[in-house]
Amino acid sequence: SYLPYQKGVYFPSTADKEKISVGAERQRRYRVIRKLRSEPTEEHLWETVLLYCGVQFKTYSGLPFTYEIRKGRSGEYTKELWIDRRGKSKSLAWSSVLLALGNIKKVGEVVERPKALSDIRGVTYIYGMFYRFGLIDVPKEVKEKKNDRGNKKQKKGREDMLEENIKFFRRL
């Protein structure tokens, strides 16, 4: 090959994530999310969950987590998500995810808290995933937690700097 690139855009949709470019991966995610939102079925959800392996999500309280899906002896994916939070893995059964999907009344509806989806093990992780996939919406306070970047000291430092800038420009 004449090109020094290891990743490309022009691979079939079945190509591994390692072979496609970041832009192509983003396009795949966009398409699968659009399909899931228009028709929230088990197949579309499974396709979305597979594409989002390794992507960081946040729980209801704003704690980050990722998940992976392992392959079984036959080479097929197992229907079990392994949630990785601070180096510890917890398993989440696919049936729990489907139960929560069945409890969503309307796509885009505001769900106040994770337990509103269902009283199942791992629902805080499912809540974060469904919000990211656009299946549910969350209250404003929760959005602020999920979008909060940095710790409180950094935030306080940014606020102090902003106040100093405002005072400086008022003097001019």
Describe each PLM feature range.
Residues S1-R31:
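BZIP DNA-binding basic region
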